[in-house]
Design a protein with these regions (language model features):
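Short, small-residue-biased leader/transition segments that mark boundaries at the very start
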Residues: 1-8
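Active-site substrate-recognition segment that forms the wall
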Residues: 95-127, 175-177
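Short helix/loop capping segments that flank catalytic or ligand/cofactor-binding pockets
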Residues: 25-26, 52-55, 119-121, 129-132
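Glycine-/small-residue-rich beta->alpha transition segments that form the dinucleotide
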Residues: 21, 40-52, 126, 145-146
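Central beta-strand plus flanking loop segment that forms part of the substrate or channel wall
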Residues: 50, 59-91
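FAD/FMN-dependent oxidoreductases across multiple families
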Residues: 104, 130-131, 135-183
Length: 183
């Protein structure tokens, strides 16, 4: 939480953490731990592309008043180690559309890094209309395309992840600094 307790004269001076260990009625339970106040000359809020504190700060300081609306997507990423014969360090592939249907924005990337590593991923706009669309399954289909599959065959996936991503472009970025902090 950030509030008037740590935001005086429009200057953020830290954060206040929430209490932990309260019951549904608000009563302290065993192991209750009270929140604490963390003061700072400058506070960095790094909670991802659509964090709750970030939304509050953008509204309070009107950080997005000169920005276009932001667009979001779900990004899925994997790291593979592949056979040296299938590796072309420095190769970059970008794709658009397929296997997504008409009207669904998205695409993929495949980067050949050092040490036989390939970073690949697929991003689907969160504005898709098909309620049956599964971004993870679309990523799996994308990896079966002959142009992608040939680099992965016989390789081993060594890492993976997913997260929400901003995809509105530079014109959609809010101002990132405000008195006492930054997003």
């Amino acid at each position: 939480d950030w509030s008037s307790d740590v935001c005086s004269s429009d200057l953020v001076a830290g954060v206040i953490t929430g209490d932990m260990g309260r019951s549904a009625t608000g009563e302290p339970r065993a192991g209750f731990q009270a929140g604490y106040e963390l003061r700072a000359r400058y506070t960095i809020f790094a909670e991802g592309c659509r964090g709750s504190l970030g939304k509050q700060l953008m509204a309070f300081y009107r950080l997005d008043e000169k920005s276009d609306p932001q667009h979001y997507g779900i990004g899925l990423k994997e790291v593979w180690t592949v056979d040296p014969a299938q590796h072309e360090e420095g190769l970059v592939l970008h794709t658009l559309g397929w296997p997504l249907g008409f009207g669904t924005e998205g695409g993929g990337f495949l980067y050949h890094a050092a040490d036989r590593q390939i970073y690949l991923g697929f991003i689907v706009s969160l504005g898709y209309q098909n309620p049956h669309l599964d971004p993870f399954e679309e990523f799996q289909r994308w990896k079966q395309h002959p142009r992608i599959r040939r680099y992965l065959e016989g390789g081993e996936r060594v890492g993976y992840g997913a997260r929400a991503v901003n995809k509105g472009g530079l014109q959609s970025l809010p101002r990132l600094v405000f008195p006492g902090g930054l997003l």
